[in-house]
Structure formats: C-alpha cells, structure tokens
C-alpha cells in the first residue's frame, strides 16, 4: 500500500457525519480542556447578558472538533446554527443572503474562512463590527450604496491555515481559540465511548491500540474504530480486543505510529534516495508525484509533530526516530570515522 489512505487523512468524509457519535454538549466533549473551560465562561456570560457572544475563531489542524464545538456553542446559547464555507461564498450577495436571514444572536459558522473571496471579506467587516451591511446597487454612475441593519449575531470561523488570514479579519475575532492534537488518553476515552455506542464494546487494550494509531485526531480515531468494528463483527465475537485491533489496523496498512503507505513512502524516499536529506520540497514533490501543497498540508504536519522529520533552510531531513522506525541505520556524517577506524 503506497497511496494516501483516506481513512488516515483528517479531511471530512461522508461517514463522519454520524450524529450519534458527536458530543452534543460541552460536558460531553472530551479533550481541549482549556478551550472548553474558556468557552463555557463566554457562553454563560452571553446568556446572562442576553447578548450575542463575541465572534470566535477556531484554528488548528483538521479533524480536531472545530465544527462540533461551533454546533455545541449554538446549542448551549439556545440559538439557531447556520453553516457555510469560505469557497462557497463566491459573491458578496451570497453572504448578504445568509446574514439578512439570521435571527438575533444566531451563530453563523464559516469553515475554511481563510479561503474567503476578498470582495466577500470586505462586506464581512462592517457586519462583524457594527452589524450593518453595505451593499452596492446598480452599476456605473447610477450605482448607490444601501445600508442594511442586521440582527446581532456570532460569527464562528474555522481555519487550518491561520497564517493565510488577513490581519483585518483576524483582528475582528474577539475569541481566538487554538485547538491542539489530542493525547492518547483523550483518544482512548473517545474510542471507548463510541465503541459502546456502535454496539461493539472495546477492551481497554483494544481501545488504546486504536487511540495510539489515530494520529492525535478524533476524526481519524472514529474512522479507524468503524473499520475495526467491521473486523470484530465478521472475524471476531463483536468485542474489540488488542489482538483484533492490531490485526485489523495492520491489514489496513496503519503501522504502530499511525503512518500509512504514503507517509512511509515519503520517509523511505528521503532515506534511500537522498541519504536522509536535506532534500528540497520541490524535489520530493516531483519524485512522489504529489503536489507541494499536498505534502505540506497532508503528509508533513504529523511527521513533524512526531519528530520524524526536520524542516531546515536547505530542505527536509530525517530525524533519528525515522531511521529507527524504518529499521535502517542512519549514515554517518561525512568525515566522521568509525570509533576504532
């Protein structure tokens, strides 16, 4: 297996929308303790004051719960939840249609907000600051600006690329919240709970095996769990043991660190063809027939987080942990002789 496994990628898949597995309240949400504690304060304050909660920006790697937290916020505020995404809002009129239909204190969630059209973003500024919408009607000399009053609302933005947000947009969010990768213990809790909901109870060692290979991401943990449940039903007795989880995940090409075929191919290329690096990203892109964006956004973040690779001014290099994981010996630096040589 050499291709990127969709199961191990944090991007959403249709099967991720299983409402039964999603937490419905902050108390049910596992992980992100600091973010949850702060959000609980902000939600309670907004409810007691009877005002719209301040605009909130969730940023961090994909699959960590940004959409789920936004839905929980709306539920705990007792208001409606509207959802869209940056690429969908092609024209200012698209955004205006959504904003003018919001009721007082509603939550509007914009996923991938870093991909907003600049013209749409300009319309968003007065809407966020003054709850007003300035629309241009007509063309040429006959054009005129119409100001529309909006109901106070809460904008919740989500981005995986904080650096791509313009400064004016970023500064208009009063509650910036970074979401972090989950610990194995947190993922273990999530896997154990969801296994019970799926009717395939997991032994502690079985749930922990799935958690260890889930790349710190609940979305991936949920997908791996579903696949392991399939194996438990067909090849086992319906229970998830450590042996069954290990067997199923190995069959799926997921190794002990949660790497898939594409990850291992990336590491092995640097090890075998470039002596561990440094090697430039463009060279890797050509050798792997992958786009640079795909390498930088999909494959490299987890390898960096695990300390398997290093980014240097001269290119990518393998860390000692990667050599060990591949079962290869790292080459000696040039000019370094053997201890007894």
UniProtKB/Swiss-Prot annotation:
Location of region: Large ATPase domain (RuvB-L): 1-182
Primary localisation category: cytoplasm
Entry's Gene Ontology cellular component terms: cytoplasm; Holliday junction resolvase complex
Catalytic activity: ATP + H2O = ADP + phosphate + H(+)
The enzyme's E.C. designation: 3.6.4.-
Enzyme class per UniProt: hydrolase
Protein name as it appears in the record: Holliday junction branch migration complex subunit RuvB
Species the sequence originates in: Ruegeria pomeroyi (strain ATCC 700808 / DSM 15171 / DSS-3) (Silicibacter pomeroyi)
